[in-house]
Amino acid sequence: MKERIVNLETLDFETSQEVSLRPNLWEDFIGQEKIKSNLQISICAAKKRQESLDHMLFFGPPGLGKTSISHIIAKEMETNIKITAAPMIEKSGDLAAILTNLQAKDILFIDEIHRLSPAIEEVLYPAMEDFRLDIIIGSGPAAQTIKIDLPPFTLIGATTRAGMLSNPLRDRFGMSFRMQFYSPSELALIIKKAAVKLNQDIKEESADEIAKRSRGTPRIALRLLKRVRDFALVKNSSLMDLNITLHALNELGVNELGFDEADLAYLSLLANAQGKPVGLNTIAASMREDEGTIEDMIEPFLLANGYLERTAKGRIATPKTHALLKIPTLKSQTLF
């Protein structure tokens, strides 16, 4: 599958740009109001007790602000944050090196935490529960366990697949938050704030149009904003008006619902099955894509907006999908 403009993952060239547009304070962070409210209370209480925060887990589709909100937590707690990802922690020694370099109340953010190996999880358990690192030296009867005390710290785990977390690991998080898709009005506000940082004038209706096509995801909204800005520059326009915005979005292949070719191909596959469940492996083979990408990158938004149902036997298109694609459903055959 070719690179999608609505890809939920951060593209290589976007890393530094994302940081520059990242909110630094609660008042700058738009959306996720319930999560923000709970976190503000927890942070205030922890600071009054002069303790570290409880370990917390953020889960949900990519691009909804798990990393951004973790940076704000660190800023509010007036402490440092160490960012890593589970695939980078291959050996227990890798984790030990990270943990022993943490200071009191520091935050360790582990992205894709569901990908930690069982051996790494075993090292992490006493660190989370007792702030203790158990290191085994040697093997067999001569093996010895050395216990190293760690300063109190907060582990923030982020995952797109909460169901793949082991129960022992999940149970060790004191707080767990499901990140929700954003409303068009929230995304429009994010877009307008980002446009100010980019020194780009944008019409209200242009921000609304980009927001409508951003699949409820700030990362996609900001990406589309920057691509539309490119079109405006080429057209020698200092203002992103509705005409330029519509032209750019249509050229980028993102329709008014935020769907691209991959989404429409996926939905067509289900709709043409005429109510019969389609297995994930069949979908992956037909689209020439791996199952994980389909589950993480295509299905969440479609599922949240009622375009498919997941059953034990496979995926089924809903009447909403048939109406969108103008593919009629076959009427059930009866004897009368």
UniProtKB/Swiss-Prot annotation:
Function: The RuvA-RuvB-RuvC complex processes Holliday junction (HJ) DNA during genetic recombination and DNA repair, while the RuvA-RuvB complex plays an important role in the rescue of blocked DNA replication forks via replication fork reversal (RFR). RuvA specifically binds to HJ cruciform DNA, conferring on it an open structure. The RuvB hexamer acts as an ATP-dependent pump, pulling dsDNA into and through the RuvAB complex. RuvB forms 2 homohexamers on either side of HJ DNA bound by 1 or 2 RuvA tetramers; 4 subunits per hexamer contact DNA at a time.
A biological process term (GO) from this entry: DNA repair
Source species taxonomy: Bacteria, Pseudomonadati, Campylobacterota, Epsilonproteobacteria, Campylobacterales
Location(s) in or outside the cell: Cytoplasm
Keywords: ATP-binding, Cytoplasm, DNA damage, DNA recombination, DNA repair, DNA-binding, Hydrolase, Nucleotide-binding
Designated name of the protein: Holliday junction branch migration complex subunit RuvB
Main EC class the enzyme belongs to: hydrolase
Signal peptide: none
Organism listed in the record: Helicobacter pylori (strain G27)
NCBIfam families the record matches: PRK00080.1, ruvB
Subunit annotation: Homohexamer. Forms an RuvA(8)-RuvB(12)-Holliday junction (HJ) complex. HJ DNA is sandwiched between 2 RuvA tetramers; dsDNA enters through RuvA and exits via RuvB. An RuvB hexamer assembles on each DNA strand where it exits the tetramer. Each RuvB hexamer is contacted by two RuvA subunits (via domain III) on 2 adjacent RuvB subunits; this complex drives branch migration. In the full resolvosome a probable DNA-RuvA(4)-RuvB(12)-RuvC(2) complex forms which resolves the HJ.
Family: Belongs to the RuvB family.
Molecular function per GO: ATP binding; ATP hydrolysis activity; four-way junction DNA binding; four-way junction helicase activity
Binding residue positions for DNA: 310, 315
Region spans: Head domain (RuvB-H): 256-336
Disulphide bond pairs: none
SMART domains with a match to the protein in the record: AAA (SM00382)
Catalytic activity: ATP + H2O = ADP + phosphate + H(+)
Predominant localisation class: cytoplasm
Pfam families listed in its UniProt record: AAA_lid_4, RuvB_C, RuvB_N
CDD domains given in the database record: AAA (cd00009)
Binding-site list for Mg(2+): 67
PANTHER family linked: HOLLIDAY JUNCTION BRANCH MIGRATION COMPLEX SUBUNIT RUVB (PTHR42848:SF1), PTHR42848
Region named Large ATPase domain (RuvB-L): 1-182
Residue span of region Small ATPAse domain (RuvB-S): 183-253
Gene behind the chain: ruvB
A Gene Ontology term for the protein's cellular component: Holliday junction resolvase complex
